[in-house]
């Protein structure tokens, strides 16, 4: 279902290694910025290694070797692979576990405009996938990019009574966001000044009562 749904937006399926040299993560800075969720170990020669929780670093390394020509962009790849993340509180069956199967995708562009157009195309592809799967309770919300970084991020939330996250939904403007990314915009309402007039206010002791 995923491969069919993503066929129009991702043309290349790859399979990155689960075990990666720590040097890739040290170069990006995430080796130090990510906490204990990243599983680290050393091989028999003492070289530091990691178990992939995501593969941004590996994708960049691939493009370094492959994407030397301008004509090869935009460049999109995806994989469906086992990930490892040392969760502090594994729970809820398949909702949050240390080992899981995830579809992750990476794209590379020559302009911000091309990236934004492609992001919207991918977002619509996921909406079609959930619709085909018959999961109407899924909603797309604005989210915080977190350790992944980036300026724009959305996540698809499955509405369930056992969920732990809260989301904000505006029925008037269709704004949706999780609590980490939600923004509150207060508009100042102004009215024309009116002339002062005397008002009879018997048995009223506060401004609220007069209003």
Protein language model regions, located:
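Conserved alpha/beta enzyme-core scaffolds, especially Rossmann-like or related mixed alpha/beta domains
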Residues: 96-150
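Short Cys/His-rich metal-coordination motifs, predominantly Zn2+-binding knuckles/fingers
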Residues: 173
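NTP-handling and nucleic-acid-processing catalytic cores
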Residues: 29-33, 43, 55-69, 178-211
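Beta-rich nucleic-acid/ligand-interaction surfaces
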Residues: 16-36, 136-159
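Residues forming anionic-ligand binding surfaces in small-molecule and nucleic-acid pockets
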Residues: 37, 42, 47, 75-113, ...
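Short cysteine-rich clusters marking metal-coordination/redox-active sites
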Residues: 170
């Amino acid at each position: 279902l995923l491969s069919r749904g993503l066929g129009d937006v991702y043309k290349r399926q790859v399979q990155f290694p689960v075990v990666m040299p720590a040097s890739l993560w040290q170069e990006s800075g995430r080796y130090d910025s990510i906490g204990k969720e990243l599983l680290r170990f050393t091989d028999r020669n003492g070289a530091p290694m990691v178990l992939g929780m995501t593969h941004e670093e590996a994708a960049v390394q691939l493009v370094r070797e492959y994407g030397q020509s301008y004509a090869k962009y935009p460049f999109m790849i995806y994989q469906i692979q086992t990930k490892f993340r040392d969760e502090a509180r594994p729970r809820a069956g398949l909702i949050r576990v240390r080992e899981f199967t995830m579809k992750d995708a990476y794209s590379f562009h020559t302009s911000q405009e091309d990236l934004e157009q492609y992001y919207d195309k991918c977002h619509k592809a996921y909406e079609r996938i959930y619709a085909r799967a018959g999961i109407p309770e899924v909603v797309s919300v604005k989210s915080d990019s977190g350790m992944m970084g980036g300026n724009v991020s959305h996540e698809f939330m499955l509405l369930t009574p056992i969920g732990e996250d809260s989301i904000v939904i505006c029925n008037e403007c269709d704004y949706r966001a999780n609590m980490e990314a939600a923004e509150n915009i207060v508009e100042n309402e102004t009215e024309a000044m009116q002339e002062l007039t005397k008002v009879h206010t018997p048995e009223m002791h506060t401004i609220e009562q007069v209003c």
